[in-house]
C-alpha cells in the first residue's frame, strides 16, 4: 500500500478507537477516510485519535479527533487513554501532555495499567456550551421528550467538557430507555446549535452513578469518557453525590468502572483502562487499510 501510516485498533471501556500515527506528516485524516473505515465491520469505530507532531512547546503531540461520521470532535476521554497506552508502549514514558482543539490535556499511566486524564475545567455558561437560548441556571434547563404532562425525559443539566453535554437524570436503569429513538432527536435539538452528547444518568449511591450515552457524531456508544465526566460534575453540582464517584457505564461489556474526581481546583480527572486489539496500516486520504501480519504492540 502506497502512502500509508500505522494505526492501532483499541478500545477504552469498549468505546471503539482507532489510533492513527500522523507524525511527520502535514496532512490530516480525511472525513472520507473516516467514513470508509467505519463502513467496514473490522475497523468500525466511535472516534479516530490522530497523533500529530506537537504544535506548541511543552506538549508531546497534537491530537486531531474525528467521529465515525467524519465530523470533528473536541474531546474524547476514552480515546485519550488509548493514545497514552500506545505512546507509553512505544516510548516507555508514563506521563504525557497533549494539545487538542479544546485545549491542553495532561495524562499519566499508573503502575497497575490504569490511565488518568485531566479533562480540564467544566464550563456552565450557556454561551460556552453553547445553547441557542439564554439560561442563568444550566444545572436544570427547560427541555423534554414526551407528553407535556408526562415527559419521558426532562430538565437536563447541560455543560461543556470541551464538547457539549446534556445529562438527563433518571430513576431507573438507563438501559430500559429507548435511547436509540430519543438520542438523535435530542442530539439535533434546536437548543444545541453545535449538537450535543446525550446521557441518561442514574444515582446508585452517594459515590456511584450508572450512565448510558448517545454520542454526538457517533450515535449509541458503548462508552463515552467526557459524558462520564459531565455526569459526575452534574451529580456533585446538584448535590446528588460527592465530588469523586465511580461510573458504571451501563452499555459497556467491560465491567471496570471509571473513576471521576472533580477536584477542588475545578479540574476533572478521569481514571480508567485502555486495551490494545490489533495493528495495521491505512491510507489517511482514502481509508484503504491492511492488518499487520505481525502485531507491533505500539503505533
From Swiss-Prot:
Protein name stated in the entry: Diaminopimelate epimerase
Cellular component terms (Gene Ontology): cytosol
Keywords for the protein's UniProt record, in alphabetical order: Amino-acid biosynthesis, Cytoplasm, Isomerase, Lysine biosynthesis
Site (Could be important to modulate the pK values of the two catalytic cysteine residues): 165, 215
Pathway note: Amino-acid biosynthesis; L-lysine biosynthesis via DAP pathway; DL-2,6-diaminopimelate from LL-2,6-diaminopimelate: step 1/1
HAMAP family for the chain: DAP_epimerase
Enzyme class: isomerase
MF (Gene Ontology): diaminopimelate epimerase activity
Pfam families, per the entry: DAP_epimerase
Enzyme Commission number: 5.1.1.7
Residues involved in substrate binding: 15, 47, 67, 77-78, 163, 197, 215-216, 225-226
Record lineage: Bacteria, Pseudomonadati, Pseudomonadota, Alphaproteobacteria, Hyphomicrobiales
GO biological process terms, semicolon-separated: lysine biosynthetic process via diaminopimelate
Alphabetical list of PROSITE patterns matching this protein: DAP_EPIMERASE
Source organism of this protein record: Agrobacterium fabrum (strain C58 / ATCC 33970) (Agrobacterium tumefaciens (strain C58))
Enzymatic reactions: (2S,6S)-2,6-diaminopimelate = meso-2,6-diaminopimelate
Source organism superkingdom: Bacteria
Signal peptide range: none
Biological role: Catalyzes the stereoinversion of LL-2,6-diaminopimelate (L,L-DAP) to meso-diaminopimelate (meso-DAP), a precursor of L-lysine and an essential component of the bacterial peptidoglycan.
